[in-house]
C-alpha cells in the first residue's frame, strides 16, 4: 500500500461510520445497543488499518501518514465539538436525532477511540506531536470525558482504550501496574530502537527545513512599482 492509498484509507476512517438513533441513553436503550453494534464494525475497520500501517517497513512513510492523519483527526474533533456544544448536546442525554448532530456525535466517539488506538500503538510518534500541542491536549481531554459519559464504551471490549490512552498521555495518573499492552511485542509495532529515533529526528529536521523554505517563499516582496521608483 503506497502513501496516497494509506492516506485515503485513514481519511475514510475519520468519517462517521455509524448512524445514531434513539431517545434516552440507558443500559436498556435499544437504540444505544444498535449504535454499539455498528460502532464495533467501525472499530474493526480502524484496527485493521492501523495493523496494516504498523506492518510497513518504512518509518518515514509511517511518520508522514500519521502526520497528516493526526492533523485531520483533530480538525474533525474540534469541528464536531463546536457543533455539539452549540446545540447543547449532552453526552449522557438523549441521542441526537438531527443528521448534523448525529454525525458530530459519531465523529467524537469514533475519532477519540481511534486516537486512543494510535497512541497505544505508536506512542513515540504521537508523543512527538502531542506533548507540545496544548490545543490537542484540551480537545482529547474533552473527547475522553464526553466518551466516558455516552455509555458507548460501557461493558465492552473497547472500554479500556480511554483509560489506557489517558494514562499513556499523562492526562491521568498512571496506575501502579500500568502497561501499554502494545509495547510488549515490539516486533508488530514501531520498535524502540536507536535507528528509529535517528530516523524520527532526521524526518523532523527535513520537515522543519521544508516549512522554513515555504515561509521564505511566502515572505514580503518588493512590488514592481516600488522597485521602479
Swiss-Prot record:
Residues bearing glycans: 148
Post-translational modification: O-glycosylated, with additional sialic acid modifications.
Biological process (GO), any one: placenta development
Coiled coil: 196-218
Keywords: Coiled coil, Cytoplasm, Endoplasmic reticulum, Glycoprotein, Nucleus, Secreted, Signal
Region (Disordered): 191-229
Quaternary organization: Interacts with TADA2A. Associates with the PCAF complex via TADA2A binding.
Protein name: Coiled-coil domain-containing protein 134
Organism: Rattus norvegicus
Amino acid at each position: 500500500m503506497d502513501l496516497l492509498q494509506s492516506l485515503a484509507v485513514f481519511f475514510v476512517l475519520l468519517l462517521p461510520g455509524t448512524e445514531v438513533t434513539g431517545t434516552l441513553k440507558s443500559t436498556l436503550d435499544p437504540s444505544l445497543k444498535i449504535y454499539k453494534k455498528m460502532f464495533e464494525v467501525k472499530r474493526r475497520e480502524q484496527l485493521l488499518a492501523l495493523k496494516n500501517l504498523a506492518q510497513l517497513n518504512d518509518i518515514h512513510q509511517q511518520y508522514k501518514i500519521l502526520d497528516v492523519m493526526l492533523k485531520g483527526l483533530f480538525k474533525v474533533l474540534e469541528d464536531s465539538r463546536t457543533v455539539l456544544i452549540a446545540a447543547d448536546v449532552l453526552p449522557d442525554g438523549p441521542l441526537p436525532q438531527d443528521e448534523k448532530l448525529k454525525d458530530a456525535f459519531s465523529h467524537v466517539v469514533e475519532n477519540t477511540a481511534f486516537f486512543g488506538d494510535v497512541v497505544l500503538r505508536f506512542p513515540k510518534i504521537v508523543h512527538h506531536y502531542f506533548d507540545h500541542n496544548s490545543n490537542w491536549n484540551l480537545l482529547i481531554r474533552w473527547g475522553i470525558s464526553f466518551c466516558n459519559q455516552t455509555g458507548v464504551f460501557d461493558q465492552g471490549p473497547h472500554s479500556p482504550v480511554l483509560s489506557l490512552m489517558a494514562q499513556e498521555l499523562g492526562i491521568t495518573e498512571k496506575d501502579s501496574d500500568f502497561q501499554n499492552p502494545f509495547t510488549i511485542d515490539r516486533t508488530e509495532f514501531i520498535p524502540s530502537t536507536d535507528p528509529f529515533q535517528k530516523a524520527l529526528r532526521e524526518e523532523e529536521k527535513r520537515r522543519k527545513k521544508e516549512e522554513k523554505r515555504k515561509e521564505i517563499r511566502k515572505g514580503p516582496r518588493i512590488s514592481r512599482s516600488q522597485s521602479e521608483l
